[in-house]
Structure formats: C-alpha cells, structure tokens
Amino acid sequence: VENRILQLALWQQFAQCANLTLLCPARLQSLQRADNAWQLTLDGGETLQTRLVVGADGANSQVRKLAAIGTNGWQYRQACMLITVDTGAPQQDVTWQRFFPSGPRAFLPLYDSWASLVWYDSPQRIRQLQAMPPAQLEREIATAFPARLGPVKVHAAGSFPLTRRHAQRYVLPG
C-alpha cells in the first residue's frame, strides 16, 4: 500500500474519533518521568501528562532518544535504491522479485502505469546508479531487470544504506 494512501486512510479515521485530539504539527522537545506517568513538552511549550508513550517515530526516534533507550546494530554491506518509474502501460496487481548474487531486485506496481523498482546492491554500485542521469539509469534498468519489465521512464529515485538496528529496551515503565 502506498504511503500516501495509508496516510489518507489514517487521517480519515482520525476525523471520526471523538476522543482523539491531534496535536499537529508539533514536535516532542522533552520527555520526563513524573509520578508513574510521563510528562511531554512540545515545541510550542505545551505540556502533556500520560501513562503511555508509544515511540513509533522511525529509525531515528526522538522518543527513544529522549527516553535514553540505546540501540544495537550494524551496517550491512548493501544499499537499496528505490526508483519510481512509468512503464507506459497499466500494471496488473503483480509483484515480483529476483535474486542475484549482489542482492534482490523487485517490481512493485503502484497505480495506472506507475511502479517502484527496488534494487539492492553494494553501496558503491548504488552510489554510481544514483549519480546517473535518468536516461542512463533507464538503460541500466533495461540491462539489470528482467526483459518482461519492458522500457521504463524514470521519474524519481532515492537510496539508503541497509542497517540493522534494535532498541536495547522495548518497554520502559512510567
């Protein structure tokens, strides 16, 4: 499911919850224990008190950092490139993945003729691909992906290193 579709569904559900107060946009500035509860201070100076804080704010979690919960992890010797492409033809709801010695490559249909390509490889190779102009990247895709993909038009691309990371604690009493 595309991120924007998921976000839209969440916002629509939020609108139907009478007991939900959205504090948006707001950033968490501090988090402190206070009498079997947590006191949160937001960037606008507002303070909140709650018995439960859920840190679901990503790999570089501000909640985890403010709660002084460390992480263990390491970098894999791989990186991943996500490439948004137009295939020029409507896509069926078919996803595929092929495995290569350098890492998997996958096709994820989005909507109409749009799709995401996922390319795992060495960090050096991904940096090389990221530096290519779209026309050159399209030629590399034609060479590296199965022929059934057909020609594509690159519209956006991004990459990130693959990292394994686990919190040292997953529960911290308030």
Model-derived features: positions:
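Conserved FAD-binding catalytic core of PHBH/FMO-like flavoproteins
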Residues: 56-162, 166-167
